[in-house]
């Protein structure tokens, strides 16, 4: 715990008041003025605005968010009667990675999701430890519910953590009776979904227009898949889109090879021509074409998905995938009302240099963490430990 406390203080000293990209500033702007301008999660904007109400900027938010994460790691020692001497060096090694030393200072919804997921699952583990004590059990379960519900609302795929938590809850509560386990698991999952939906509803600005975040996100995925399809296989025809707008579809087909990359979806945003053409084609036509790709050209669809996930899971050149973000950068009209200014100072340069030491090491390999998780899960199951 001492190592983690020292790590938290070192991280805060190196990163406060935090690192903000355009998305960070845009959501802080929404939270400060209680408006909706982007399709980012309303709950995250509200959280940033809430902490900004106490101390201007993101210093307090970063501190609380990081304290949640480091506190959750420290709480793991309470799950066993005694802690191995290995805990201190392992904790020190973890603290030195960019994921803990730098990422905790980045004001991104992804980091909040990760911290909430870890905190929620640690609460669930403590609930298992004190299960016979109903009062303490429900306190831990309430903490898990709040954190997992919040996490599910700030990241598009955040609900996955809730699914895994529901499986764990069912296992813990079953006590050898599978029907009881299913009831607890389903009940826990429904509670997270309901609580998360309530959080988002309450965080919505009172006079904001109808939220289009989900539909906008789906449309972006549709565009990305279709552009990828015509890039990987020029023979694939966009007939359904062409029937709705032949001129726009022609531009899309011409520009797709230059704008598609499995690395990031952002490249499409840099080409005004293809952006305008995509906007000209109706949602109905694009969706019909997307269904055609998925169900009538499934092999090509899977090729597109494979290319995307190849860069997600095992990027050939990690430097191209924004492995770290430092400083503050956003349009001046968004930063000025928040009393923010562009920042990339010497300390940011040094942190960036520090992060690059890890780029081509196992620290940035997803496979390492999958392997560690699998080994630990197998060990705990073999030892019959929660």
Named regions from a protein language model:
Residues 42-46, 54-71, 88, 103:
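Loop-to-helix entry region of an early transmembrane alpha helix in multi-pass inner-membrane enzymes
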Residues 9, 140-155, 166, 188-192:
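Membrane-interface alpha helices of multi-pass inner-membrane proteins
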Residues 63-82, 119, 123:
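Transmembrane-helix motifs of polytopic, lipid-linked glycan transferases
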Residues 32, 75, 113-132, 146-148, ...:
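Specific aromatic-rich, kink-prone transmembrane helix
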Residues 207-340:
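Membrane-proximal stem/loop segments at transmembrane-domain junctions that anchor or position
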Residues 15-27, 35-47, 55-59, 282, ...:
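Extracytoplasmic catalytic/substrate-binding loops of multi-pass membrane glycan-assembly enzymes
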Residues 22, 105-112, 154:
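Short acidic/glycine- and proline-prone juxtamembrane loop motifs at membrane-interface regions
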Residues 56-60, 307-386:
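Membrane-interface anchor segments at the N-terminal boundary of transmembrane helices
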């Amino acid at each position: 715990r001492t190592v983690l406390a020292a790590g938290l203080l070192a991280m805060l000293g190196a990163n406060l008041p935090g690192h903000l990209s355009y998305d960070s500033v845009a959501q802080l702007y929404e939270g400060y003025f209680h408006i909706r301008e982007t399709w980012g999660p309303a709950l995250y904007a509200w959280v940033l605005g809430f902490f900004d109400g106490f101390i201007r900027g993101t210093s307090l938010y970063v501190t609380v968010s990081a304290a949640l994460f480091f506190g959750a790691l420290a709480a793991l020692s309470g799950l066993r009667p005694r802690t191995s001497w290995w805990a201190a060096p392992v904790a020190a090694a973890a603290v030195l990675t960019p994921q803990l030393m730098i990422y905790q200072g980045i004001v991104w919804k992804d980091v909040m999701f990760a911290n909430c997921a870890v905190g929620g699952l640690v609460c669930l583990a403590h609930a298992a430890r004190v299960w016979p004590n109903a009062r303490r059990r429900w306190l831990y379960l309430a903490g898990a519910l709040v954190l997992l519900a919040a996490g599910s609302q700030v990241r598009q795929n955040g609900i996955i953590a809730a699914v895994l938590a529901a499986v764990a809850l069912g296992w813990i509560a079953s006590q050898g009776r599978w029907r009881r386990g299913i009831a607890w698991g389903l009940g826990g999952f429904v509670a997270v979904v309901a609580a998360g939906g309530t959080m988002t509803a309450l965080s919505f600005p009172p006079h904001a227009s109808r939220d289009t975040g989900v539909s906008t996100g789906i449309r972006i995925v549709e565009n990305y898949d279709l552009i990828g399809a015509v890039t990987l296989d020029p023979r694939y025809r966009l007939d359904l889109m062409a029937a709705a707008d032949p001129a726009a579809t022609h531009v899309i087909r011409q520009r797709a090879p230059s704008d598609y990359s499995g690395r990031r979806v952002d490249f499409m945003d840099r080409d005004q021509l293809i952006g305008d053409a995509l906007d000209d084609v109706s949602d109905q036509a694009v969706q019909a074409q997307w269904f055609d790709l998925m169900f009538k050209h499934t092999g090509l669809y899977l090729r597109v998905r494979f290319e995307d996930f190849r860069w997600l899971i095992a990027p050939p050149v990690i430097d191209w995938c924004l492995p770290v973000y430092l400083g503050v950068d956003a349009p001046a009209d968004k930063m000025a009302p928040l009393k923010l200014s562009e920042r990339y100072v010497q300390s940011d340069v040094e942190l960036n240099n520090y992060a690059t030491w890890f780029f081509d090491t196992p620290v940035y390999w997803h496979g390492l963490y999958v392997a560690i998780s699998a080994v630990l899960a197998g060990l705990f199951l073999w030892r019959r430990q929660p």
